Regions:
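N-terminal beta-alpha supersecondary unit
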Residues: 1-69
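DPxDG-like acidic metal-binding loop motif
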Residues: 64-93, 98
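Short, flexible loop segments at boundaries between secondary-structure elements
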Residues: 186-204
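Phosphate-handling active-site elements
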Residues: 47-57, 86-96, 111-114
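Surface "functional belts" at beta-alpha junctions
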Residues: 21-27, 33, 92-191, 210-211, ...
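Short, well-ordered alpha-helices that flank and scaffold nucleotide-derived cofactor binding pockets
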Residues: 40, 44, 83, 87, ...
């Protein structure tokens, strides 16, 4: 199975995944200009993998995309691009929350019965976070729902149900002091191969409804007048 995986939660990352293994990757570290950078990054990743730069000729079987949570503009660009890429290649597009991927990566490094709190920077001195348990070796179960709020809300949840914080990047500076005495687990970089594992597992269970490409904004966009419920 050959996949294009892309994520625009913060920077823009495109990877080619072949049978669960990342064989090429391209990224733009800027948190801006997501829409403009995706197509060149796709071509760069395909060429680095030794594949035709034209997506329709590259033997892609599916397109994977991170569904957030993330700010409106970058997330929308990623999801729209994933749907367009899938249409061009004539293949399905599947979405996975970046926090699901971060949680699974953390659990890969911990005891199988661990609870983790996957976090990401939500800006405005806030965090996106969710509490997770393992669902077998390749998937996760979200306890409750994904949240957005200041670090005190996360710490309150951790007092009620202890677990380890797993960050998908360095812990945001605005929350680092408050989390200094919390139980900190691994810090990871989002791995497209883990996204692929989650997708494969959910498809094998007939759980396509958990692979939708709807955006997880969690709050209203900074740009007023834009829709939040759907693209």
């Amino acid at each position: 199975v050959r996949e294009i995986a892309l994520d625009t939660q913060a920077a823009t990352t495109v990877a080619v995944v072949d049978d669960g293994r990342v064989i090429a990757r391209a990224h733009n570290d800027s948190g801006r200009h997501h829409a403009e950078s995706i197509t060149p990054l796709v071509r760069e990743a395909l060429e680095a993998a030794g594949l035709p730069a034209q997506l329709a000729d590259a033997g892609i079987d599916r397109v994977l995309v991170g569904t957030g949570p993330a700010p409106f503009t970058g997330l929308r660009a990623g999801l729209v691009s994933a749907r367009v890429l899938a249409a061009v290649a004539g293949v399905p597009a599947y979405g996975v929350s970046a926090l699901d991927v971060i949680a699974r990566q953390g659990l890969d490094l911990l005891a199988p019965d661990a609870r983790v709190y996957a976090i990401a920077d939500a800006r405005r001195r806030e965090l996106y976070w969710g509490s997770y348990l393992a669902a077998g070796p390749d998937d996760v179960t979200l306890e409750g729902r994904l949240e957005v709020g200041d670090v005190s809300t996360l710490l309150g949840a951790m007092r009620a149900a202890p677990g380890l914080v797993v960050a998908g990047a360095p812990i945001p500076a605005h929350s680092a002091d408050a989390l200094a005495h919390a139980d900190i687990g691994p810090q990871v970089s989002l791995d497209p191969a883990v996204m692929s594992r989650i997708v494969a597992t959910r498809l094998s269970r007939g759980e396509e409804d958990r692979l939708h490409t709807n955006p997880l904004y969690l709050r209203r966009p900074d740009i007023q007048g834009q829709p939040t419920a759907r693209l």
